[in-house]
Amino acid sequence: MAQVLTQFDTIAAISTPIGEGGISIVRLSGEDAVAIANKLFKGADLTKVPTHTIHYGHIVDPKTKEVVDETMVSVLRAPKTFTREDMVEINCHGGMIVTNDILQLLLANGARMADPGEFTKRAFMNGRIDLTQAESVMDIVRAKTDKSRQVAMTQLAGGLLDKIKTMRQELLDTMAHEEVNIDYPEYDMDDLTSQEMKKKAQEVSKQIEQLLQTAQEGKIIRNGLATAIVGRPNVGKSSLLNYLTQDDKAIVTDIAGTTRDTLEEYVSVKGVPLKLIDTAGIHHTEDKVEKIGVERSKKAIKEADLVLLLLDASQDLTAEDKRLLDLTANKKRIIILNKQDLGTKISQEMIKDITDNPIIVTSILKQKNMDALENAIEKLFFSGIENSQNQILVTNQRQAGLLTKAKQSLEDVISGIDDAMPLDLVQIDLKNAWDTLGEITGESAPDELITQLFSQFCLGK
């Protein structure tokens, strides 16, 4: 359970991406953060400046007296900081050498190198955020679309936390009521309190079910929709990838078989991230390199959430086209009849006789009817998703798994009462549900889970 801890040492890390840029930020957090930074800083005395102020000066090696860089240094004092500890942020010029030199000086003067995610972990351990909010910090960093960011911001603001806390309080109130009955059986309130317990278990179970119904939507918004672009060679797959990405990542030529591997790219369709995979054409080949590409394409199709299957509308349906139609028959897919400007030998009616999947007729190179493709994707997966950034969504497998576990405990409460089990035994399942919900927010999460979760963060976060 999150609690305020004061015995942490002082940590330091580079918080910005390593490389050349306008500025880099080196971050400190801990009881000695200001004192350590002050050893290196020539300008104002950082130990005497007000909190939440920024100061111009130079970082100087205290041993050699060499000026390392010209900097702006922010001083942020506990408890109104991200970690609820004293923090210092050194804004230096954005270069690998100068940034690392400043970090090494901080480490040589009393700071410790931060573990991945340790700043956010301290924010959690000091009670500033819960685990769902900590996860949302990582989601904001990794957001691939505006919608991903908006959903993560809702989580960071405490949307899911508030919902979980409300459900836990309802269960806690019920448990307290039942404890009175168990401890004072002479009042003979079994029938009344058991029915109240059942009703509350049903109510909270329904709330959990409503959250679980958002899990698929939340997963897609957070992780993206794995989308395989499939078709025989030279049918327009790379042209579709280039149109959607507005980029030349995939090589487009008139020679069949030029995409010899799977190429991945993220794009935003109606605000939802699609992880596009441009696959090699699936066809018989003796070329060893192409064979590898074909096998990877089959694997990509198997793992895809959505298949965009391209057919050349200007040519008759080939044996390879038919194989691809069979290979993707059990996938969610959209059929794209491309090159319709060159003539129509494959019509919508012909494909409708084979499948009831959505069909888009287009010329990708001439960008005809491409908005229909985005609309078809939205309709297939995301109907009603437009306002989801304001919804409370379950966005990862950990949350969904724990909600499912809590719901099962509540179902056990209901069945136990129906079977007239003793209240003290039913109470165990009720407490299990309460504890499991607490794991979601971190209030009753084991240390191993907390350590594993924060290890997924980047350094400096």
From Swiss-Prot:
Binding site for GTP: 234-239, 253-259, 278-281
Annotated localization: Cytoplasm
Subunit structure: Homodimer. Heterotetramer of two MnmE and two MnmG subunits.
GO cellular component terms attached to this protein's record: cytosol
UniProt lineage: Bacteria, Bacillati, Bacillota, Bacilli, Lactobacillales
Name of the protein this chain belongs to: tRNA modification GTPase MnmE
Pfam families: MMR_HSR1, MnmE_helical, TrmE_N
The protein's Enzyme Commission number: 3.6.-.-
Gene: mnmE
